Regions:
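A generic structural motif
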Residues: 42-48, 105-106, 146-152, 196-200, ...
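Broad gene-expression machinery/nucleic-acid interaction feature
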Residues: 35-39, 67-71, 139-141, 187-191, ...
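Glycine- and acidic
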Residues: 40-43, 98-103, 142-149, 269-275
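ATP/Mg2+-dependent ligation/transfer catalytic cores
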Residues: 1-133, 155-158, 172, 287-292, ...
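Short beta-strand elements
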Residues: 83-92, 188-198, 246-248, 255-264
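Short, contiguous, pocket-lining structural segments
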Residues: 105-113, 130-136, 148-159, 163, ...
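Histidine-centered divalent-metal-coordination microenvironment in nucleic-acid enzymes
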Residues: 71-81, 133-145, 177-198
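C-terminal accessory/tail domains of diverse enzymes
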Residues: 151, 158, 162-179, 200-303
Length: 303
């Protein structure tokens, strides 16, 4: 355990400022000689979870597999890389930027950053699954997959930190906000792909429909856990469902839950699902915790 000043991090009052750090995951840091990054939980002085410690709300489940897709913008002086410097001007409309190549689509320094970030994450043992330029100009994504209820969320937090630190030397900022620019521009999400042992091995249409009913029942609870300002992003446009609605659909990126073709193949209804509502600035621990609780409630009927 390591004590720290919680008042300086807005986690405690100055008159009673001590908080504790409990290490939970260790990552080699290739940017330092013999260096490591330590992911820690925050505890109260008595050893109980601090109110900000959403990691402690996740029930351990090695059968829960989670893949998170972290989207973000790279910015300089408040404008995404590649956008005109004039605040009243915009780049060409979306269409050429997704998985784009060439200076006119992705510029020069952005790819250096995302490739270097990938290398540092891999050296750290983070299960970094890939990178791509996203739909809006200056927007990028990386993906992290983990087996076990905590792993993907731990690794997303560390990967975020690595990206922020890396961008310092390029004079570039990371914009995590889910809708930094209004208008005909995609927002940034953190789609949550998930499966359990039961979902992968047994599944079934009856189980799936019960699961979707439960996700709809807890629609508001899920939205509350999926990140701030989501009303700006979940509008029913730009590959989203409206924030006040719930829907699912096979291969439907305008639905709340996208069902892959592989899930319904041969009417098996088993595999993984994608919740498209979590946003880019959401707390991955809160996201995984909420998904896990809803799924566990349904699967309890089958045990």
């Amino acid at each position: 355990m390591w004590g720290f000043d919680g008042s300086s991090t807005l986690q405690a009052e100055g008159s009673s400022s001590d908080c504790l750090l409990k290490p939970v995951a260790l990552f080699p840091d290739c940017t330092r000689e013999n260096g490591f990054l330590v992911m820690s939980e925050v505890l109260n002085p008595d050893g109980t979870p601090h109110p900000s410690n959403a990691r402690a709300t996740i029930a351990e489940d090695q059968g829960l597999w989670v893949g998170l897709e972290q989207e973000y913008f790279l910015q300089q002086d408040g404008r995404p890389l590649g956008w005109p410097e004039d605040n009243n001007s915009y780049p060409a409309p979306q269409g050429e930027y997704y998985c784009g190549a060439g200076y006119c689509n992705v510029g020069d320094v952005a790819r250096q950053i995302v490739e270097e970030h990938l290398d540092i994450c891999l050296a750290a043992g983070i299960n970094h699954e890939g990178i791509n330029a996203e739909v809006a100009k200056g927007q990028w994504e990386f993906q992290v997959f983990g087996k076990g209820a905590h792993k993907a969320a731990d690794q997303i937090w560390v990967a975020r930190y690595i990206l922020l630190r890396l961008c310092e030397k390029y004079g570039v900022d990371v914009e995590w906000h889910c809708k930094p620019f209004l208008g005909d521009w995609n927002g940034s999400g953190m789609h949550c792909n998930f499966s359990t042992d039961f979902m992968r091995d047994t599944g079934g249409k009856e189980y799936f429909l019960k699961l979707m009913d439960k996700f709809e029942e807890y629609k508001d609870e899920h939205i509350a856990a999926y990140g701030p300002d989501n009303h700006l992003r979940l509008t029913g446009l730009h590959e989203t469902q409206s924030i006040d609605k719930f829907s699912w659909g096979v291969a439907d990126r305008g639905a709340s839950i996208r069902v892959p073709h592989s899930f319904v193949k041969d009417d098996a209804y088993k595999g993984y699902l994608e919740d498209r509502r979590p946003n880019s600035q959401g707390d991955p621990y809160k996201i995984v915790s909420r998904v896990s609780k809803t799924v566990a409630e349904v699967e309890a009927e089958y045990k």
